[in-house]
Amino acid sequence: FPLVLWLVPTTTIRKQTVDALKNPRHPYRAALDDAFSGRVRVFDIGDFSQLLPHDLRSNCGVVVGTIQTLRVKDTDGRKVYAHHEMLEPHFTGVPDKMPGLEMIEAGRGAGTIKFSFANLMHLHRPLMIVDEAHKAVTGLSRDMQLRVNPTAIIELTATMRTHSNILHSVSAQELKDEEMIKLSAMPSEHMTW
């Protein structure tokens, strides 16, 4: 089953996305349930310790987090990059020196694989969805992508960059017709400006 890492720009959008994906009546969840025969598990990134190997083997897993949670220069002090014993079952059978995985640098366990959320993502090569991707274009974003090791990246944006590989485009009218525009746009001309 696939694993999806869905990254959004703010905590508010993260909560809204998690709520939508957990709601069986929401169109997003309904589409996932149809595609995977109801075998879908949705997690907030803050609850990554609840991920079990069985969840990832037997279900489509969707982990929703903010871009800022993973996009850092220094990984020290970030929970998603820290060693967590409860993630050990995910690393059973993984070779000791697997390329791309962060290792414990000092102290007990030095030189062994760090049982971290980021390493778990690296192993599973998730599909990465980046909401409002135009806000996520930095060198740090590329570093984060290398750490996570996604199979593919889908960028959702209203502001495409040049040289983007556009798979699908939606007009503002189509969004309005589907009631996906949250604020009404009422442009007016101000002669005093």
Regions found by a protein language model. Give the residues of each.
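RecA-like P-loop NTPase motor core of helicase/translocase proteins
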Residues: 1-193
